[in-house]
Amino acid sequence: MKYNANTSNQFRAMFFKNATFLKRQKCSLGVQIAIPMALVIVLVILKLWIESQIENNSGPVGDSSGDDIMGSYISYKFDYMQGWFYTINPNNITNIGYKDGYGNGTGLLGGINQYEIYWNGSDLWVPYTVAVESGQKMNDMVLAQKQQLGQSSMGPLTFPIAGIQFNEFNPQNNLIDLTITCEQQIRYAYNNFENNLIYVLSQIQTSFINYLLNGNGVVVKTQISTLPYIYKSQQFDIASLLGGSFFPFALSFVLPLFMYSIVYEKQEKLRDLSLMMGLKMRNYWIMTFIFNFLTYVVIVSVISLICSAAKVSLFVKGSPFALFLLLFLWGLSMVSFAFFLSTFFKRTRAASIFGYFFVMVMVNLNSTLSLFNTSVPVFYYWVPILAFSRGISTLCGLCGNGLCPPLSQYTWDFELSRILFWLFIDTIVYLTLAVYLDKVLPREFGVPSHPLFFIKDLKELFSKKGKYRKLRDGDGINEKTKLINEYTIDGINNDDDDDGLMDEDVKKERDMIVKGEYNPEEMTLIVQGLRKQFPGRPKPALSNLYLSVKKGEVLGYLGPNGAGKTTSISILTGLYTPTSGTAHIAGLDIRYDMDKIHQVIGVVMQFDVLWEDLTCEETILYYTRLKGTPKSIEFESTHNILKEVNLLDVKDRFVKELSGGMKRRLSFAIAMTGESSIIFLDEPTTGLSIETRKDLWGTINELKKNRSIILTTHSMQEADILSDRIAIVSQGKLQCIGTQTHLKQKFGDGYSVRIDIQEDYQNTHNPTDLIKSFSPSATLSETFNGSYVYRLPKDSIISDLYEYLVLNKEQYHLQEWSLSQTSLEDVFLKISANDDTVN
């Protein structure tokens, strides 16, 4: 039963796999949640603490509801004030006078209202006056006092209350003109008043009136208060003001983690295996995008709830829709930008280090530029994290000062509107670049596409594909002539290879396929003139390959490295497209039906490609869902597959806890998902112990009962034991094909006989004459300590040789002998002797 792997099935498979895998990544998940939460919690704590300090240190205020109107009374009382005034008389005006610390005085200043204090062991009348020559002299004296005080934490307060410069004094005209110099630094002011000016004016007014009234004891006292007011809470919000630095970090730290997840699947070849098993590349990008964005949404939602509960202005004032757009578009552009950056990395470590470094540098760069509050060039908006950081910082600054912009303010002239636009553009541009660069940049596994691949795809879409589709009669191979027609349509010349140089069996295989001389119902795989030419390489990686595999057959597909094995399998599994030619798998054409073909093939890669933090059951469930197994039977199908490879008892065990043999069987189980018709085994037992290897051989023999298998291996023993037929490729061409016995007889050098002489006769007897008398063309190939090895031609009759040795055993003192045919390894080495990659 074949299943339909539609988009919804693949979305479901990827979502559950990603969610389960992320849940198991406790460290990664902790970082994703802890860093943003920690930053926001610190921000909220700072907000609450600073607000409490402001509350505790504020003066009388009105009702916060704003319904009551009241007056606030603030009185400056000058009792027990001690200090002095500097007086400056640059015009030598008469009758200015003075007032000393003993209560004596003359002229205008003699009318200052004093009081007595006890100071340094004696009585002192204050305030008193000290005359100085000029304002500059006064300033020098004050600065010297401040410098001296700055070097000592304690000491007597010797600062003047103020400096008074008399510009004009004319009692006859009731005129006085003066300049008052007051202390403005809180550090040097007295603790019982805030404004020296009020006190100085009171004293001057008292002196002036007493002077005019001839000293009648007038005292002027001044009090100040505010007008009535309606109370409003402070307009600034410290959390929003500080949020300009906190929020960009909190909402950007997931970017490196998104990069990590994509690079990890490339590095471990997990994505490649998923593609071979039927995952559509567009579905991979879409689902990865959605999953990463949902992860971001969860983090943003939690942050928003915390900040809303703490009444951070950014989240409770202004336009909720505008804030939603900013956060929403940042999420989209961040995921796209993470995709874009991930295309340049092959290792997770490098991607993570760069990601975190990039985030910190960009956020700090924006914070530095924001201090100058200058406009930025357009290219600034092409980096999403800079655009978002500037947008959120600007919004935080406005809301922090009680100026949250309403939605009506978001016009094109408002920078935040332009930032929203650029984040949308960044999303589209970087997502497009990510998909494009992923196809064309050099990669560790596979060959990149041509930079202009999309032109070829468009050309084929409107030309060849349409023409070909009109000639097709169905999805299966139901007529022998169908292949002949397709062979002609593609323009494949069956004389591409020189018939005189082509092996007879290879030519026979080709003619059988071209002429349709086979039963389509018995065939799982038909390869027709498959060719692959990579750009920039002088020779094709694969040249005019014809091959067939029957149902239930194991084909040993052998060849040296670089011979074309991997290229041909990559084409058959959909990783590459052929330059010319085609192939049919279960009646489906690899050029046009690859989505359906992925549902009927399984792949076991050379090394185990597994998610270490998934269980056996979760691993198989992912691929079962990927291939479209109905939801109602997906668990039943998973358990049946695990049972078939003897892993059902450990279905809940994590992959990282499995032995090497168990992991290999799990890889076989992956290939069996979705009722696979054909399985590609790439070096299935590499690196395993002999016991584990033999156990897996038994598993492979069980698998082939219902499926066809293509086996690639460098173990000739493995190929000899498991294969029904052997195909050897070299220099991109099929060199020979047939059963093991047939190939050994055809390409082997005959037989090898080993004879051991009894120990007492090793120096006196030599069996060479005996072997030569049986076969004159026999040759001695090896001798050592009474042991002789001879090569016999392949037309030798083994039964006659055995009888001949028995008859002459006593005469030649033969102790024992053994016979062996030419090995498959000998055939392989002979076939590949002229391969450039070997030599």
UniProtKB/Swiss-Prot annotation:
GO terms for cellular component: intracellular membrane-bounded organelle; membrane. One of its GO terms (molecular function) is lipid transporter activity. InterPro entries: AAA+_ATPase, ABC2_TM, ABC_transporter-like_ATP-bd, ABC_transporter-like_CS, ABCA, P-loop_NTPase, R2_ABCA1-4-like. This is ABC transporter A family member 7. Its main location: membrane. It is found in: Membrane. ATP binds at residues 559-566. Keywords: ATP-binding, Membrane, Nucleotide-binding, Transmembrane, Transmembrane helix, Transport. One of its GO terms (biological process) is sorocarp development. It is a multi-pass membrane protein. Belongs to the ABC transporter superfamily. ABCA family. Residues 525-756 form the ABC transporter domain. The chain crosses the membrane at residues 30-50, 238-258, 286-306, 321-341, 352-372, 378-398, 419-439.
